[in-house]
Amino acid sequence: MQRLAMDLRMLSRELSHYLEHQVRVGFFGSGVGFSLILGFSVAYACYYLSSIAKKPQLVTGGESFSRFLQDHCPVVTETYYPTVWCWESRGQTLLRPFITSKPLVQYRNELIKTADGGQISLDWFDNDNSKHYMDASTRPTVLLLPGLTGTSKESYILHMIHLSEELGYRYVVFNNRGVAGENLLTPRTYCCSNTEDLETVIHHVHSLYPSAPFLAAGVSMGGMLLLNYLGKIGPKTPLKAAATFSVGWNTFACSESLEKPLNWLLFNYYLTTCLQSSVNKHRHMFVKQIDVDHVMKAKSIREFDKRFTSVMFGYRTIDDYYTDASPNRRLKSVGIPVLCLNSVDDVFSPSHAIPIETAKQNPNVALVLTSYGGHIGFLEGIWPRQSTYMDRVFKQFVQAMIEHGHELSSM
């Protein structure tokens, strides 16, 4: 490492002398434009390779899980090369929804009933053409949980399915109540602390295919919900393993970060309007218990949660809700192998709130922390239209757990 630093300093000095010489030549000759462009390109490449492209930090609670990931999910130990012209957190976060493609995935929709009379929309990708698992009863099943206002149509969900389709697995996307176009039958939506709907979905899917390996993956709020479920239930779950991406570990820290002026302008206010739009669509269902007009005046996610979410789910205060919603406090109780990918520059999930010490105390948990990637960004390649680093981590981990998961118990 010291040798590399010395080489970079020497290269910088030589580059400085070169640029100075070229500028002098350019003033009295020609070609200064090309020389400057070449020089700055070399300088940028040196900076990128030395400061931006880095291997992720792998934090595990046990040596066995660490060795397992190194052997069967090597992407978590390889250098992550963010898109060279867009590696900053906000840039990655903003760009991904617009630049990544949306692969065609043919879903089969199913509406299931809940105990309170509501309904949940599930979108299935059965993968009936699977050459590896032709018997549907034993075909591995992966449950996907989208983010705060997301559905099965999100590009990151589509890419997770598309990239892994060749593995032959079956996928089912859990759409939260009222967001996927279905009618809201009861005055209740969703939040990341109440796991009742997720428990209903997991029970339903497992009852359909009890002999099939069953895994789950959650993105952003979907990951928070999944971790809260796993922390509550411990090892008594039909899930074999799980993965989360861009989880907000401490809801208070997330809210504080998103309320900073620039983050509020770029992300917070927009997401608040998305939440309000969903409420307004089903306004007639809430008028008896919620002051909807007051909710529609909220200017931040925190204000929305104070006026709507915390009230709907019976919390005395917004602080009570945010405490219960934070998955960091339940991580120690997770009883199955879980891989959690976060970027330390994610403004939705500040690095200081990532529970590194707690993860070290649970042999079932692995944190994969990249230096860059933003929130559900993880763009890579010159023109990042296709799969991301997150998609590759998902594919390798799911495949590792389904094909080699038995090795963990023997390590």
Curated annotation (Swiss-Prot):
Q: Name one GO molecular function term.
A: phospholipase A2 activity
What family is this protein classified in? Belongs to the AB hydrolase superfamily. AB hydrolase 4 family.
Give the range the annotation lists for the signal sequence. Answer: none
Known InterPro entries for this protein? AB_hydrolase_1 (IPR000073), AB_hydrolase_4_CS (IPR000952), AB_hydrolase_4_sf (IPR050960), AB_hydrolase_fold (IPR029058), ABHD4 (IPR012020)
Which gene specifies this protein's sequence? ABHD3
Broad class of where this protein is predominantly found: membrane
What range(s) does the AB hydrolase-1 domain occupy? 140-247
**Enzyme Commission code:** 3.1.1.32, 3.1.1.4
* Protein name stated in the entry: Phospholipase ABHD3
